[in-house]
A protein has these predicted regions:
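Short, solvent-exposed, Trp/other aromatic-anchored flexible loops in extracytoplasmic proteins
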Residues: 71, 84-129, 133
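Hydrophobic membrane-insertion alpha-helices, especially the h-region
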Residues: 8-24
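Surface-exposed edge beta-strand/loop patches
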Residues: 116-157
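A structural detector for beta-sheet-dominated domains
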Residues: 37-39, 46-48, 66-68, 76-83, ...
Length: 157
């Protein structure tokens, strides 16, 4: 009887150690997010994991642009490029008018830090059409992230 309890406790302990090791590894070995700002400071871009839990379940990443001013503006076109190749483009008409944060594209893969990412934004402000090209290359390291498996389990309840 004592021997079977010892074996059961040993198996449970090893399983717990393996789970904890995986949890720590998965939480600390995450790809970095990428960020960029326009030269005039009007726009900020971030390439990060999608926060919407339904999309996060699919391990999707999103590129969001944020308007950093209080003035009225209207987006004419947004183009997302990876290594100079257009990955997505649009006019953001599906976003609320004058939304400060706009989803540019939702990608299936995390960013590759060896690639060159740019976002070209064309907008109208005070009756004047303007264009900005934003380099998205500043790495933001993520020190600890809950693995998506754990997020999925927690979101079921």
């Amino acid at each position: 009887m004592k021997k079977s309890k010892y074996i059961l406790a040993s198996i449970f302990s090893v399983a717990l150690l393996v789970f904890l090791a995986w949890f720590i590894y998965a939480g600390t070995h995450q790809p970095p997010m990428l960020k960029g700002n326009s030269k005039d400071g009007k726009w900020s871009v971030i390439y990060s994991p999608e926060k919407d839990i339904d999309l996060a379940r699919q391990d999707l990443w999103a590129v969001h642009i944020t308007w950093k001013r209080d003035s009225e503006f209207s987006i004419k076109e947004v183009v997302f490029k990876e290594n100079g190749v257009v990955e997505a483009s649009g006019d953001a008409t599906d976003e609320p008018k004058n939304a400060k944060k706009i989803a540019v594209v939702i990608m299936g893969d995390p960013p590759n830090t060896n690639n060159d990412y740019t976002v070209e934004v064309t907008w109208e402000e005070n009756g004047k059409t303007q264009k900005d090209i934003i380099q998205v290359n500043k790495e933001i390291k993520r020190s600890f992230v809950f693995p998506n498996v754990i997020k999925r389990i927690l979101s079921l309840g």
